[in-house]
Amino acid sequence: METNLLPGGPSYGLLDESGVQMETTVCRPVLSPTHINGTASETFTVLQQKMRIVEEQTSSLRDDLIMLGYGDRRGQLETPNYLEDPASQKAISPIPNEVICPESPGNLWRNYEFLVNRMCYLENLIQSLKMNIFHLQTEKESNPQKTAFLNDQLNIIQGEHSKGLKLLQLEVMNLRQQLKVVKEEEDRAQDEMQRLTATLEIATETKKNAAVIEEELKTTKRKMNLKIQELRRQLAQEKLVRESLETSASSMLLKVQEMGSVVEAERQQVHALQEKCTALHSSMKTTQDLLAQEQRKNEDLGMTISQLKSDLNSRDNLICKLVEENKATQISLKKEHEENIYLKSEILSLQDVSGKAQVLNDQLSKKCSELTSMLQVVKMENSRIIAEHQAILKVEQKMITETFQEQNLLLDAAHASITGELQAVQNEKAQLQIHLDHLILEHNQCLQKSQEAEKRTVVQKELLESTIARLQGELKASLQEKKSLLEKNEWFQREVNKTEKEVAKEKCNLEKELAESKEDINVLNQNLQTLMEENKHLTNKMASLEHHKATSDYQGKVEKALEKITDSKNMLAYEKGKLQTKVKQLEAQLHTFAETMLQKDHLHKLNKALEVKYTQANSELSASKAYLEQTEAHLKEMKSILGKNEEELAQAVKCRDAALKESQKLKGDLKALEDRESKKVGNFQKQLAEAKEDNCKVTIMLENVLASHSKMQGALEKVQIELGRRDSEIAGLKKERSLNQQRVQKLEAEVDQWQARMLIVEAQHGSEIEPLQKSLDITREDNRKLAMSLEQALQTNGHLQSKLDHLQEKLESKERERQSLEAFKEQVAEESKVEAELHAERIEALRKQFQTERETAKKASQREVSELKKALDEANFRSVEVSRANRELRHKATELEKVVNSNKEKLKNQRAQIKLHLSAKANNAQNMERMKQIEMELRQMEIIKDQYQKKNYEQSLSIQRFVSEMNTLQKEMELLTKSQYETSARNKQQELRLVAERKMRLELENRCKELEETIRHLKRCKEATENKLKEASVESEQITANLEEAHRWFKCRFDGLQLELTKNRLQRLPREDRWLEENQDMMHNVATSQSVLHRWETKQKYHSDTERKK
């Protein structure tokens, strides 16, 4: 509540904080402020209010320290009950109406200014202490290693402090001298006040008016006390809210720490899994090398078979088609291999970035630990400082109460002798009223400025609240992202386990296929040997058949046998082509298997990168939480400081209004207050030196924070550049993948199904979120199970490695044999090529010979038939020739029987060969069944490959999501930097406003000095008027004496004249002329005396007018 006395009317206004003017009418006329001066009780109440405000601020500091963690020392920090409870305090008895002393107003104004400056200085010191405590906390948290530099600065500041103390001591000496002068003036004033006791009746009326004003002030005080109680209740509510927020923040921090420990344990497990996976990869590489060697052997065997059966032109087209298909598959495999290489390069770059982020996170964690230790030290120091400050305040309160009691006694004695100068001061009313009007205008301007400042603070508060809400929303979003990352991590772990199981199964299947392929190779070698024997046997048969071309029947049989042989060769070539295609398919499958292994490695690396990114995201979340907490604390402190500034402005206005009344009553307090202030100045200067050091520390810490922030921004820019490159590369990959749209269309349907399942799972997970501890226990049990399974896998790997070592030894021996066989095969292949060419030429020649022999045999048979007819005709005539012919025929018959027996043996041999051929066909059928099984397994492998490609596609989608999340995090970081810049700008604006307020304060001080000078001038004028009044009183005494003498003379003359009149009544006629002449002389004397009095009055008026003009 602010009071504003309205001059020149019968009413005065009370201005409330809301600006509403409450007018109360008074029956008496309004007195000027010179007549209504504040008593010692009013000064005591104002000072008591200020001390209560200081106590409330100290209690708020105590509560802040208790909130920071000094709950055990609560008993040391609590203030006594008589300071906190206004009801327990003794009521101040009203002081009786007293006469106001206007003596020595210049000294009273000086004392008033000194006390007001002192109280403002104390309030500014309290604010600076609060800011220094905050700066100490932040400084000690950030820069614990710069004590030497700060000690040097301390020494410099202590030197400056000693110089300042010397200057202050000189100023104190000057002030003491001034006090001596003031005391002398007070003694003089007391001597003069003893003369002016006649005007006490006039002072009683002023006392009554002062009593009425005191009652109104008491009502305003009661209202202010009610408002203070409401504010205290609000502060208690805010404290409870702060405690709840701090408990929630501490619980969140504990949860984050637990999550960090779990993540570290999972990292260790992942590292173990990676090592095991590398061991498995090495073993798989060895098996792949063995498979490649066996494939090479198979290829060599196929080459031998193809060289042996190169005669068959019918299968060349099929082989060309198969070669084209193989080329197409190789091109597709090359493309996929290039994609895998590109993805590997991306993973390596992401691993580098994650490594850098881990280093930065480690640095931030170290800084956080150092800051926590510094916070604890600062809390201890703050508790100690507050205890000392409370003790000093208690001592000061006691001293102030004693001094006020003394002042009350002195003022009670002085009020009896103060009322004499009221008549002399009435001439000075007009000038003082003009000054009061000017001061009222300035007061209204100050109120307008304070209202504008309040509006600005309200706008700033709203902006800060909006930023806090936005930061809370970002925190919630980051927590949701954290949950999603945890779910993705679990999903990746499951996929890794599945892939490991699938790899183990594939390894077993491949080992089985290797054994079966070895058996097939042995069977094929046997078949080759049988075919070589058959070829040799056929060549022998061809040689024997060339000797026996005589008869056509045997030639037909031989041709049938040759046709059967050619058919069997064609069948063998067809089976050879099938085997070659199957071998190529197996090679392609092995290549795909190798690529799947590479993709598995790629997935492991992606899993590592995602885990690193997860840890990085956790660290960034923790850093953002810490930064948010710091900003919230800073905002709260800024709010409290703004509220206190507002309260201090209102209190300063009240103090100014009250100080106008109390300026003439504060002379006796200066000595004791100066002694105490000298002590306080020393303590506060020490605190200022410490505060300066703390400010330097805070500046250094802010520079370090800005440097680290700039580094983080550079790292983020690099990551963004890399992500841009990767995005361009991904776009190129997408263009390449457009060629495989048929597969993608199939996979998209499955992806939609999986996404639907994932949405269902996410909904279930969102509806069934349990506490983090249960999930952590489950993850620990899963990790133990994984460790057991990994141990088992390591054991199995050990066994498999031992077996692989044996196999490698066997394979080395086989490789040696193979090398020898390859050399031998090359020779055999060359010989077989030559022999095949010779056989082909011989077969063609034999065919031509058979055709020519058939024609010649037909012609010969026809000729023989004609000759036989001729012979039969001649047989009758030539019996002797017939008998000779019979003998020759018998001889030929015996030879033919021999030929038939030999042909029978040949037929038996051919039947045996046919049986072998049938057995070979049965083996080929078995091989076909095995090849069908292999084809089924290959189809299964293709299905697995498709699934793996689906997983890769899902992982690519997850990577894209992660990249988008990283972009969002970068945007959030940019927003945070913008908010920091805005807060810094606001702080700068507030600093500028504080500078402006300081300038206003200096201007007010200058105006107060000017007013003091005017008061001094008025005092001088008053002294001059008093001297003139003394002179006038002396002159008036002289004039009164002269008038008395003239009056006596007139009386004597009048008496004489009356006597003469009585004597001369008898002699009227002759003596009338003489009497008239004497009467004229008397009237002339009276006129001269009246003219002298009129001149003296005009002179007095002229002197008074000149003095007023001065």
From Swiss-Prot:
Residues 122-250, 288-313, 413-695, 728-1048 form a coiled coil. Transmembrane segments: none annotated. Keywords: Coiled coil. This is Coiled-coil domain-containing protein 150. It comes from Mus musculus (Mouse). The lineage of its organism: Eukaryota, Metazoa, Chordata, Craniata, Vertebrata. The gene is Ccdc150.
